[in-house]
Amino acid sequence: MARLYVGNLDPRVTSGELEDEFRVFGVLRSVWVARKPPGFAFIDFDDKRDAEDALRDLDGKNGWRVELSRNSSSRGGRDRHGGSEMKCYECGETGHFARECRLRIGPGGLGSGKRRSRSRSRSRSPQYRKSPTYGRRSYSPRDRSPRRRSVSPVRGRSYSRSPRGRGGSPYADGRDGGRYRRSRS
């Protein structure tokens, strides 16, 4: 099986229209057209040679970009990202991922198998592992209340401009130049 990515599609194109264009090259397994966001589709061929023929003839036609998909398997989990070349982190074998590894899963189901031990430098120190509150954060009531903005005036007072300092730039000497003064109302 081979999967083609078809990009730069008109948002109104239907799976039937794509099926008509691609089925002349060989047997199709499925046609999936994206709707959110629109503009691309995946076409699954039974035979990789048929997909390559379609790629050669249809790439650029109607402004489409057609290329072999990097994920050429529709089965969930296995062979994703070229799984035959990827190695398992648990056992080092190719063809599966660590979450599917028989060493990790074991005979009793998920999590019952033996895992490789981590290096000493990456393990947590004992006092953190034994602490029941490790990873929890305690919040004080002060943390939960919204912070007060320091720029808002204190009740009972208002700020007004003083006529002094209106001539030059208020920032000429790095301060406000006396432009804003507080006065009681």
Swiss-Prot record:
GO terms for biological process: mRNA cis splicing, via spliceosome. SUPFAM superfamilies: Retrovirus zinc finger-like domains, RNA-binding domain, RBD. Transmembrane segments: none annotated. PROSITE patterns: RRM, ZF_CCHC. Pfam families: RRM_1, zf-CCHC. Signal peptide: none annotated. Residues 2-73 form the RRM domain. Gene3D superfamilies: 3.30.70.330, Zinc finger, CCHC-type. Residues 113-123 have a biased composition (Basic residues). Keywords: Metal-binding, mRNA processing, mRNA splicing, Nucleus, Zinc, Zinc-finger. Disulfide bonds: none annotated. It is found in: Nucleus. Extensively phosphorylated on serine residues in the RS domain. One of its GO terms (cellular component) is nuclear speck. A zinc finger (CCHC-type) spans 86-103. Residues 104-185 are annotated as: Disordered. GO terms for molecular function: RNA binding; zinc ion binding. Expressed in roots, leaves and immature seeds. Belongs to the splicing factor SR family. Involved in pre-mRNA splicing. This is Serine/arginine-rich splicing factor RSZ21. It comes from Oryza sativa subsp. japonica.
